[in-house]
């Protein structure tokens, strides 16, 4: 940092780890020409006065990081803004990051700072964005009245964000105003105990405005909060016990038709403490969406203008307790929500849309004066006080229910008109007084309350007050009807019409009409309603008579005043009729109810049925008798002998000890509840729960059909269910002492089963699809059952007997239950499964399906284990499992893997996989092992004898054939002087065969699997040596030489690098011939040569160990020609030429020890220059000098048996210098006058070979490095030839020169390869003898041919044979 007299500045990054004295009381600027970053770290404490001002990023992005307990304290002595982070640039950003316990940034003013600019800017200037991030106990405190701008403070956009996360993380600005995104988006997030306090807080401006407060002790404290936003969904979201504390008002305003939200959500909603919530312009919204049933909201709600504000209650029960008198916005209650109030001021003048519950609880009179629509519930409880509607028009569109409890209500005038579209429910403790005349409402229901209809006129057919319903009349509940002149009721004829059926006698003499429902639907028959006087006393004049059927007294009937829906079921009447039946007879003598062709009320019994006798039903097939009195309490048998029975209310079957359903009969519970002792349904009968709730307390048999939805509770005894019930969809509860026995998996249909008792399946096969829960027992007896439901909440016990099979396909099927298995447990999973269930027993466990099954110590079964498909995984590395199974059968598609082992025997027809993340896994078989052409898979670090490896330990005997596949994990290959033990057999292994499966290769070596010698004959070892040695001595001696199994690929790599360096090596006499050309410089006719040669060769050699035998075939084509000649006078001449070539070499290597083979190939191109000097260019006698240089590039490939193919490239330079001297040692004539000239030419050549191969990593990780480049190849030899001149060829320019050449070749380096550093080289090439013979000839002035055959012989069986043909054509 550059500190001058008055200020300090720097560009880029400044990190301060100790308090810097040189900055004392000076302005500091970081980033004047680039982004600036100031890091204060390592508990550095920057005290007041060190920085007079701090500006980070001047026209660039800026950031301040105060971390790891560091502190930055500032005051305002300079008179300018004390802290600016990121300023004066379009779209720049400023960040203040405070993280770590005791990390703090603080600012306080000084007495001398009066009138100074005390604002703090994080993101300064038009369009600037600002972030304040406080984590892990960091603190930002402003200790005086200072404006804080997060994001731009001037128009032009610019977002602001404050994130405070973690306990003790806080920002304190109690005397300051904070602006977050004043002209853009504003975001504040307080999490996990983060806290923010400010005097006034302004969030958002031209964009989004969001505040999130979540987590215990997360708290936002302010004197006033203003949320503004013109886009998105601006608002405050409070969850998980977060706290919003505002001393003044929370102001929610929006623009551009957006919604501003104050959101209370989560299971544990947060708290708001404020002077009030101001709903301003726009769609300002308060949302309650939580799961609490007792959440209190006390902040007052205020509409700035009439109609401002929306309160959405989306879920949970919210108590509005504040003074909301000035709220005139919308209160919207959704079906899953409830709003509770105790004072009119709690809902103010709100307009209510009620599709949920509005609960009024008060101890005073209540006049409802709000406008309300919707179809929900208005529940009113006034503690015995009056409730009324102030204005009849406010609720005329409310189509829901007015539910009154402990409340007085006058059904007349405005109260009646207000309920034009609603239903009135008379709840417990409520008294409704019907006004004089007819009161028309939508619907009426009794639920324990009373209705006072006033006086009854003697002889009249109605009371002075009557109710008319237009939609529904519910008289199937409890309640009371009151009249004020009970003596006039006595005028009703007390006549018993014996000519009517018993089912019609409960509706007879319906004389005085109280409720007219002639255009409505009537549900129930009024049998549970009492007739009372005005004081609530029962009006009664009862008579009793015997009920005789078939000459026997079967019951006693009681006749009295009662309420009824009348014979036509068209309202509510006072009549004199049957009110009670006391059952006396049982069995065949039981009271019989018979529809006898009637329907409706004529086939309904609304009188109370009591007594200890039985009740029988015997209608014709298809005819129905209904019961509608929920006070029935008879205890005898309910025998449905014929026809159907319909329940029209709860408990209409009383306390019956048994329901008997005969063939072709039907009981329809019609959505109602009933408790009975036994259920006995005959085959062909139907029990339709139909949305109801049936409880069985004793034994029973269901041989008929069970159907419908609802609930079935078996609280005791044994219920036998015969056959399937596919349309039965109830939720079944089996209590602790109860049992359900089924012979069909769909006996309980498809619904959920909560089982705390016993669910027994006998001879039941198929899919049990029900979702199970509870802690009871599911027992299989001679059954083959697959459980397919989601039983995650089932913690009970599955019991499988010896003749049964239980099948599960996933963890959710078994839940967390235990399994006691004496039969077959089949786990048929196609996805991976961690078995957490305790499984015991002597039965078989069968693993099928392609997924894996991992077992822990909970796998305690001792029976046989069959792994038919997929994998069975034992334990984990730190928690191995010894499977207690007596026998494990691994099928062809199965695999056993993991850690630990098997207590019993193992038969392997599939895979026994010991591999894991690191080698060293030892799997133990406590019994015998039988290989049935299965595979053993292990990981080994293929190095020396001490290498880490997986191992199979067999405590018993071993037999059969097993393939062993070894994977190298990081081994580089080495000489295993004493081998690596991978299989150990304590018992007899004479009949066992563990056979190596595929190549086991690492580095330069092939490892082989074989038995140990001598006493270790029962063990199997991996070795890279020729023979399996005795066990390792201690200490292990150092290996010497190559007494190990080399990989054939080593010689393939070697053959490639050797061929690439040698295939384009040429000699002068392989480029013979001359043509004429015009010198490009002098224009004189000159002699030139244009040549091409073809060579094919065959090569044989061995590596240095003698293990690898290689032979290869090559082909080379080269062509070239002179491009310039010059001389220095006389007959000497220089020739300069160019040449190019293509060649390929294909090799094959066999390893004599292992029998493995590999193939290699290399093909490439070369281009180069040559230069030749002849002392006598005309005769080529005397001395010559020849040199050339070529650059070659090659593609290489190697493929070994059982290994992936490898490819790489090589390239480099080769160069040669050759010299010799030719002279004619004589001439002689032969027959026919032919002249023969004899020449001898000693030769010497020096070739430098510099082709290098790229470094290669094989697929198995072996590093391949070719060697031998830089070899200097020398040749010393002599060539002799005879030039024959035949008289027949005079003037034809035809001549022939047969020759013989002998050479000694020497190489300074051997071509080879290093495989993971282990060298393998081509042997026998240091000194090579060569014999070559051929002929050179000119056919005519235009065509020259030459060819030769060459044989090279070296040491160690090296030999090379080649043939070459050259051709020249003169144009």
Swiss-Prot record:
CDD domains: PL2_Passenger_AT (cd01344). Residues 1029-1046 have a biased composition (Basic and acidic residues). InterPro entries: AC_1, Autotransporte_beta, Autotransporte_beta_dom_sf, Autotransporter_pectin_lyase_C, Bact_Autotransporter_VF, OM_autotransptr_brl_dom, Pectin_lyase_fold/virulence. SMART domains: Autotransporter. It is a peripheral membrane protein. This is Uncharacterized protein YuaQ. GO terms for cellular component: cell outer membrane. Pfam families: AC_1, Autotransporter. SUPFAM superfamilies: Autotransporter, Pectin lyase-like. Keywords: Cell outer membrane, Membrane, Plasmid, Transmembrane, Transmembrane beta strand. The keyword Transmembrane applies. It comes from the Bacteria. Residues 1020-1048 are annotated as: Disordered.
């Amino acid at each position: 940092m550059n500190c001058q007299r008055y200020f300090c500045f720097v560009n880029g990054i400044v990190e301060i780890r100790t308090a810097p004295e040189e900055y004392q009381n000076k302005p500091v600027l970081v980033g004047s020409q680039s982004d600036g970053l100031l890091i204060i770290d390592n508990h550095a404490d920057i005290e007041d006065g060190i920085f007079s001002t701090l500006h980070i990023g001047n026209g660039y992005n800026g950031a301040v990081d105060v971390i790891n307990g560091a502190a930055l304290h500032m005051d305002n002595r300079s008179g300018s803004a004390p802290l600016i982070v990121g300023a004066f640039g379009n779209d720049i950003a400023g960040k203040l990051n405070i993280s770590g316990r005791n990390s703090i940034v603080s600012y306080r003013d000084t007495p001398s700072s009066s009138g100074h600019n005390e604002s703090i800017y994080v993101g300064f200037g038009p369009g600037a964005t600002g972030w304040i991030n406080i984590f892990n106990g960091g603190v930002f405190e402003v200790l005086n009245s200072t404006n804080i701008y997060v994001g731009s403070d001037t128009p032009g956009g610019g977002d602001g964000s404050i994130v405070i996360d973690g306990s003790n993380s806080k920002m304190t600005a109690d005397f300051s105003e904070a602006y977050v995104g004043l002209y853009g988006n504003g975001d504040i997030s307080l999490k996990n105990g983060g806290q923010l306090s400010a005097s006034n807080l302004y969030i958002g401006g031209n964009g989004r405005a969001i505040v999130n407060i979540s987590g215990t002790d997360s708290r936002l404290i302010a004197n006033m909060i203003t949320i503004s936003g013109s886009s998105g969904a601006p608002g405050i979201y409070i969850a998980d016990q977060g706290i919003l504390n505002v001393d003044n008002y929370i102001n929610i305003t929006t623009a551009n038709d957006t919604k501003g939200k104050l959101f209370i959500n989560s299971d544990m909603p947060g708290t708001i403490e404020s002077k009030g919530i101001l709903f301003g312009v726009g769609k300002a919204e308060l949302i309650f969406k939580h799961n609490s049933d007792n959440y209190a909201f006390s902040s007052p709600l205020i509409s700035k203008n009439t109609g401002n504000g929306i309160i959405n209650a989306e879920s949970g029960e919210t108590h509005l307790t504040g003074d909301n008198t000035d709220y005139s916005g919308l209160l919207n209650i959704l079906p899953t929500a409830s709003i509770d109030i105790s004072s009119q001021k709690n809902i103010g003048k709100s307009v209510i849309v009620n599709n949920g519950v509005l609960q009024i609880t008060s101890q005073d009179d209540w006049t409802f004066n709000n406008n309300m629509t919707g179809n929900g519930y208005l529940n009113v409880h006034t503690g015995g006080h009056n409730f009324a509607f102030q204005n009849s028009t406010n609720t005329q569109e409310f189509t829901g229910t007015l539910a009154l409890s402990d409340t007085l209500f006058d059904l007349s005038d405005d109260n009646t008109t207000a309920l034009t579209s609603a239903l009135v429910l008379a709840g417990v403790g409520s008294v409704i007084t019907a006004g004089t005349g007819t009161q028309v409402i939508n619907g009426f229901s009794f639920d324990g309350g009373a209705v006072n209809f006033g006086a009854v006129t003697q002889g009249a057919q109605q009371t002075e007050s009557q109710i008319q319903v237009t939609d529904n009349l519910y008289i199937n509940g409890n309640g009371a009807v009151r009249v004020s002149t009970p003596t006039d009721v006595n005028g009703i004829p007390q006549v018993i019409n014996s000519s009517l059926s018993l089912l019609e006698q409960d509706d007879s003499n319906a004389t005085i009409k109280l409720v007219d429902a002639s255009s409505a639907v009537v549900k129930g028959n009024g049998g549970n309603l009492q007739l009372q006087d005005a004081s609530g006393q029962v009006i009664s004049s009862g008579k009793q008579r015997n009920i005789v059927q078939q000459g026997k007294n079967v019951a006693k009937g009681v006749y009295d005043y009662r309420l009824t829906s009348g014979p036509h079921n068209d309202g509510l009447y006072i009549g004199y009729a049957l009110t009670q039946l006391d059952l006396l007879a049982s069995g065949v003598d039981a009271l019989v109810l018979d529809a006898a062709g009637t329907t409706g009320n004529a086939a309904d019994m609304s009188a109370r049925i009591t007594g200890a006798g039985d009740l029988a039903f015997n209608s014709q097939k298809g005819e129905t008798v209904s019961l509608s009195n929920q006070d029935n309490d008879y205890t005898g048998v309910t025998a449905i002998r014929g026809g159907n029975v319909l329940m029209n209310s709860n408990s209409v079957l009383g306390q019956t000890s048994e329901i008997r359903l005969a063939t072709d009969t039907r009981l329809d519970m019609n959505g109602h509840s009933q408790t009975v002792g036994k259920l006995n349904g005959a085959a062909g009968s139907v029990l339709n729960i139909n949305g109801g709730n049936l409880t069985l307390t004793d034994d029973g048999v269901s041989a008929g059909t069970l159907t419908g939805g609802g609930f079935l509770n078996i609280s005791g005894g044994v219920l036998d269910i015969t056959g399937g019930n596919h349309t039965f969809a109830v939720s079944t509860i089996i209590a602790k002492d109860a049992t359900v026995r089924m012979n069909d998996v769909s006996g309980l249909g498809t619904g959920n089963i909560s089982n705390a008792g016993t669910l027994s399946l006998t001879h039941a096969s198929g899919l049990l699809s029900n979702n199970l829960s509870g802690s009871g027992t599911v027992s299989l007896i001679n059954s083959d059952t697959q459980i397919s439901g989601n039983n995650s909440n089932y913690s009970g016990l599955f019991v499988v007997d010896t003749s049964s099979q239980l099948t599960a396909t996933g963890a959710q099927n078994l839940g967390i239950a235990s399994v006691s298995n004496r039969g077959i447990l089949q786990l048929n999973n196609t996805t991976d499964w961690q078995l957490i269930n305790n499984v015991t027993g002597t039965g078989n466990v069968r693993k099928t399906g392609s997924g894996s099954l991992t077992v822990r110590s909970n796998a305690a079964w001792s029976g046989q284990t069959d792994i038919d498909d997929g994998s069975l995984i034992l334990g984990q590395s730190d928690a191995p499992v010894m499977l207690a199974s007596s026998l494990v059968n691994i099928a062809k598609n199965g695999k056993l893997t993991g850690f630990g082992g098997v207590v019993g025997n193992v038969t392997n027809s599939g895979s026994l996989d010991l591999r894991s993340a690191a080698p060293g896994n030892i799997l133990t078989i406590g019994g015998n092992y039988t290989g049935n052409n299965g595979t053993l898979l292990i990981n080994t670090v293929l190095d020396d004898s001490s290498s880490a490896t997986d191992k199979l330990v067999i405590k018993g005997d071993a037999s059969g054939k097993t393939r062993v596949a070894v994977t190298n994990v990081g081994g580089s290959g080495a000489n295993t002087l004493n081998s690596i033990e991978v299989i150990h057999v304590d018992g007899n292994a004479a009949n066992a065969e563990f056979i190596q499966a595929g190549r086991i290769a690492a580095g330069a070596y092939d490892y082989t699997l074989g038995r140990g010698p001598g006493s270790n004959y029962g063990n199997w070892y991996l070795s890279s040596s020729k023979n399996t040695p005795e066990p390792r001595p201690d200490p292990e001696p150092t290996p010497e030489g190559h007494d190990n199994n080399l990989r054939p690929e080593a010689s393939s790599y070697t053959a490639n690098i050797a061929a690439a360096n040698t295939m384009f090596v040429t000699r002068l006499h392989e480029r013979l011939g001359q043509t004429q050309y015009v010198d490009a410089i002098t224009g004189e006719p000159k002699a030139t040569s244009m040549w091409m040669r073809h060579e094919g060769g065959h090569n044989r050699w061995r590596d240095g160990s003698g293990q690898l035998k290689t032979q290869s075939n090559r082909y080379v084509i080269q062509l070239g020609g002179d491009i310039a000649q010059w001389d220095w006078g006389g007959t000497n001449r220089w020739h300069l030429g160019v040449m190019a070539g293509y060649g390929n070499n294909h090799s094959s290597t066999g390893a004599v020890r292992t029998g493995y083979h590999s193939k290699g190939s290399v093909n490439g191109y070369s281009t180069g220059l040559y230069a030749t000097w002849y002392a006598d260019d005309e005769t080529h006698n005397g001395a010559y000098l020849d040199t050339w240089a070529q650059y070659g590039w090659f593609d290489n490939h190697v493929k070994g048996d059982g290994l992936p193919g490898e490819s790489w490239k090589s390239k480099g330079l080769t160069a040669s210098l050759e010299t010799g001297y030719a002279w004619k040692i004589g001439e002689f004539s032969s027959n026919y006058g032919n002249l023969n000239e004899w020449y001898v030419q000693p030769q010497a050549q020096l070739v430098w070979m510099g082709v290098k191969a790229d470094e290669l990593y094989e697929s198995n990780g072996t590093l391949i490095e070719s060697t031998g480049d830089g070899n200097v190849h020398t040749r010393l030899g002599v060539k002799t030839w005879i030039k024959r001149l035949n008289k027949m060829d005079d003037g034809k320019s035809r001549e022939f020169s047969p020759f013989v050449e002998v050479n000694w070749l020497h190489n300074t380096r051997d071509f080879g390869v290093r495989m993971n550093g282990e060298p393998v080289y081509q042997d026998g090439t240091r000194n090579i003898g060569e014999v070559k013979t051929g002929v050179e000839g000119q056919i005519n002035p235009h065509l020259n041919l030459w060819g030769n055959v060459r044989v090279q012989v070296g040491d160690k069986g090296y030999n090379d044979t080649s043939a070459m043909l050259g051709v020249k054509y003169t144009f």
